[in-house]
Design a protein with these regions (language model features):
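Sec-dependent bacterial lipoprotein signal peptides
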Residues: 1-19
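Short solvent-exposed beta->alpha transition segments
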Residues: 44-96
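A general secondary-structure boundary signal
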Residues: 20, 26, 59-63, 117-121
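Structured segments of extracytoplasmic/periplasmic soluble domains
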Residues: 33, 37-41, 50-54, 123
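Exposed beta-sheet edge and beta->alpha loop/turn motif
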Residues: 89-137
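Low-complexity, intrinsically disordered short peptide segments enriched in small/polar/basic residues
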Residues: 5, 12, 32, 80-81, ...
């Protein structure tokens, strides 16, 4: 019985430590959440919460361009394709942090590969995506 209690305690400790390792204020977490919303779910509104400055302006322009299509009932879920992304690099640029991502987008009959450069700045103690550059690979 003591062995079982110790195993349960160790399992609980491992789960607690694993969940604590996800620092939701870290720039990696913010960048990954932005990429998940913007590229994988194709949901500019959800991605917007992770942005500031130029990235927010970019999303506002995209939301304005898609407003009429969305008003007709076309949703982000319908727009979403099968998207796989992988963070490949982290670089400092002055006070900012840049993350590179490889992004693969599979449509019904084709596949696209893109490279995304996602730059974050610490604005009032919160990391925000401030610039996004996407290139075909």
């Amino acid at each position: 019985m003591a062995w079982l209690r110790s195993q349960v305690a160790l399992t609980w400790l491992a789960v607690t430590l694993a969940s604590a390792c996800t620092d939701k204020s870290a720039p990696e977490y913010v960048a990954d959440q932005f990429v998940e919303a913007y590229f994988r779910r194709m949901d500019q509104q959800a991605a917007r919460q992770f942005t500031a400055l130029g990235a927010t302006e970019m999303l506002d322009r995209e939301l304005e361009l898609t407003r009429s299509v969305r008003a007709d009932g076309y949703t982000a879920e319908q727009a979403a394709a099968e998207v796989v992304y992988r963070r490949t690099a982290r670089n400092k640029r002055g006070e900012r942090v840049r993350f590179d991502y490889d992004i693969s987008i599979k449509h019904e009959d084709s596949e696209e590969h893109r490279a995304a450069d996602v730059e974050l700045a610490n604005i009032q103690t919160v990391w925000k995506v401030v610039r996004v550059e996407v290139k075909a690979r």
